[in-house]
Regions:
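Left-handed beta-helix
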Residues: 1-119
Length: 119
């Protein structure tokens, strides 16, 4: 991710059960959205894979959101890879164990936190 200009965001698939879309969101250049994004901000070069959802979240550059993953009320740090089927922001107790959860219910996810989970 150098200083050059990125291509525009791309929304892919046009099938009834699989359609990339963003509603009331800001999506930066270089993003590819195959899942659903709602009231969120995606920084550059974010990939939201098929059947994934990102709701009320801020996703920093270079993040990959895996297939069928669900991210709600979260801040995802730069370069993170959210594994397929992972759920973030829906279970306060589980989120507090795995990540950092603020008093207001926002979950912060970093690469280091995800690496600890993989061990």
């Amino acid at each position: 991710m150098g200083g050059g200009q990125l291509p525009p965001a791309k929304f892919v698939h046009n099938q009834d059960d699989r359609r990339g879309l963003a509603i009331e969101s800001l999506v930066s250049g270089g993003c590819i959205v195959s899942g659903h994004v709602f009231r969120s901000v995606l920084f550059s070069s974010v990939r939201v894979h098929s059947h994934a959802t990102v709701n009320w979240s801020v996703v920093l550059p270079g993040v990959q959101v895996g297939r069928h993953a669900r991210v709600t009320r979260a801040v995802i740090d730069r370069g993170c890879t959210i594994p397929d089927h992972m759920v973030i922001g829906e279970d306060p107790v589980l989120d507090a164990e795995r990540f950092y959860r603020s008093e207001s219910g926002i979950t912060l996810v970093t690469r280091e936190m995800l690496e600890r989970l993989a061990q």
